[in-house]
């Protein structure tokens, strides 16, 4: 009995020691915090500088210009850098990679992106500070996260704490509109993941005390229907049938009734054209239709998106959609095609354990526990491409609101704290 009590007491003390270590900063970690604090204003000024360079995905020169700013900054902290060009026919700027190659601790892959949804013709172009809020196009999604990465690493470098670390930074140039084929546009990112132990994504934070252990994947779909062009007086007759628009209506209604409802599975028809003739421009996501009320529609097309938490869920949904499309109304035809975009990042045990390490850092800094964010409320991101190869977290970037809108903001009150947390977290991971 006495031996059992001693054994149980030793386990308790061991766990208590781990808890206390999680709640206390070491002397070195306190120096890291102080160093980050010394760069607080500089980090905000750098954020303003890169925000004021338009880098909409299709503004290739703008994306490269933002990449050059980060390239120069990483070189000053002794990272080797390279720009990965994309083939001209892909019409994408390319990606920035920066790395140091030591042999201590976990091999880290830090992911961001240089492009934004705000193209060169957007009226929202400049950084404007109002007290602790910065109105910033692409500042929250996600130049703020890129700056978090840079200044966390800068603090560690200045304290000579990166000497033996192995870290790769990957800032893609087409996250908002991924270049196709993905086998080319994401090859270097995936290769970097295969050589790493952990991937950390710095997409916008969903809350100071949240991080992302899972993200839904994204896929495109297109339904095309065909009907018999005829005078509308004969619609529904055996000779004329229902027409292309009624067939499309049937399909979309059955999608809603029969595919909808599974947790984390959503699908959305984004645009719909129908009539005698339709013309759709994919690059502009717009089109036109011509038809008359006294003519049965001969064609219709809808483009949509599908979001899912696993490949199994995606394929099951696709199978249901195909079966629905195949069951035609009289004298109509229909086809459905799918386009892969982002894979899913599943909520693995390893990701949950990594979240606990981040939470320990947060508590040690006095910021409180970090919990997992609901994947059903997040979109897709680049970290999903590497989730099959490494454990990871996302949502570690800047806080703000209004992403992808003319009211996009960065919360400067929390900006420095997030850099502190990242710097200490990276330090601990490179010492594991």
Language model features by range: what are they?
Residues 118, 161, 213-217, 293-297, ...:
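Short glycine/proline-enriched loop/turn "hinge" motifs that connect secondary-structure elements
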Residues 142-218, 277-284, 430-432:
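Acidic/histidine-rich catalytic neighborhood of metal-dependent amide-processing enzymes
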Residues 86-89, 211-215, 292-295, 374-376:
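Short Gly/Pro-enriched turn/cap motifs at secondary-structure boundaries
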Residues 119-129, 214-218, 282-287:
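Short, flexible, mixed-charge acidic loops at enzyme active sites
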Residues 23-31, 45, 55, 73, ...:
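Metal-dependent amide/peptide-bond hydrolase catalytic core
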Residues 1-25:
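Bacterial Sec-dependent N-terminal signal peptides
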Residues 23-137, 157-162:
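Acidic/His- and Gly-rich active-site-bordering loop/insert found
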Residues 110, 130-180, 221-225, 234-258, ...:
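Alpha-helical metal-binding/catalytic segments enriched in His/Glu/Asp
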């Amino acid at each position: 009995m006495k031996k059992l009590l001693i054994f149980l007491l030793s386990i308790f003390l061991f766990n208590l020691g781990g808890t206390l270590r999680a709640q206390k900063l070491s002397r070195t970690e306190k120096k890291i915090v102080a160093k980050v604090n010394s760069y607080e204003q500089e980090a905000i000024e750098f954020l303003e500088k890169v925000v004021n360079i338009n880098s909409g995905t299709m503004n290739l020169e703008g994306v490269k210009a933002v990449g050059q700013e980060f390239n120069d900054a990483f070189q000053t902290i002794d990272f080797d850098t390279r720009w990965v060009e994309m083939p001209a026919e892909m019409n994408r700027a390319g990606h920035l990679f920066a790395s140091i190659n030591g042999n201590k601790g976990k091999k880290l892959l830090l992911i961001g992106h240089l492009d934004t949804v705000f193209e060169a013709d957007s009226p929202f172009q400049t950084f404007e500070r109002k007290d602790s809020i910065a109105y910033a196009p692409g500042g929250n999604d996600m130049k703020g996260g890129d700056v978090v990465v840079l200044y966390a690493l800068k603090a560690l470098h200045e304290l000579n704490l990166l000497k033996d670390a192995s870290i790769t930074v990957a800032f893609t140039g087409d996250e908002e509109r991924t270049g196709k084929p993905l086998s080319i546009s994401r090859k270097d990112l995936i290769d970097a993941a295969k050589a790493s132990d952990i991937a950390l994504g710095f997409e916008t934070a969903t809350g100071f005390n949240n991080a992302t252990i899972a993200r839904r994947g994204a896929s495109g779909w297109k339904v095309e229907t065909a009907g018999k062009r005829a005078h509308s007086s004969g619609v529904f007759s055996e000779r004329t049938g229902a027409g292309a628009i009624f067939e499309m209506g049937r399909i979309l209604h059955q999608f809603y009734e029969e595919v909808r409802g599974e947790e984390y599975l959503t699908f959305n028809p984004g645009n719909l054209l129908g009539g005698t003739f339709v013309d759709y421009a994919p690059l502009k996501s717009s089109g036109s239709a011509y038809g008359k009320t006294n003519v049965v529609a001969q064609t219709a097309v809808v483009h949509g998106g599908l979001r899912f938490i696993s490949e199994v869920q995606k394929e099951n949904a696709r199978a249901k959609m195909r079966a629905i499309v195949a069951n035609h109304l009289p004298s109509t035809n229909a086809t459905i095609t799918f386009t892969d975009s982002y894979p899913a990042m599943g909520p693995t045990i390893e990701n949950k354990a990594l979240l606990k390490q981040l939470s320990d850092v947060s508590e040690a800094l006095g910021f409180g526990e970090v919990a997992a964010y609901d994947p059903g409320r997040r979109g897709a991101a680049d970290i999903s491409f590497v989730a099959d190869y490494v454990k990871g977290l996302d949502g570690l970037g800047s806080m703000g609101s209004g992403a992808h809108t003319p009211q996009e903001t960065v919360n400067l009150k929390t900006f420095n704290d997030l850099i502190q947390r990242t710097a200490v977290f990276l330090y601990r991971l490179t010492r594991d």
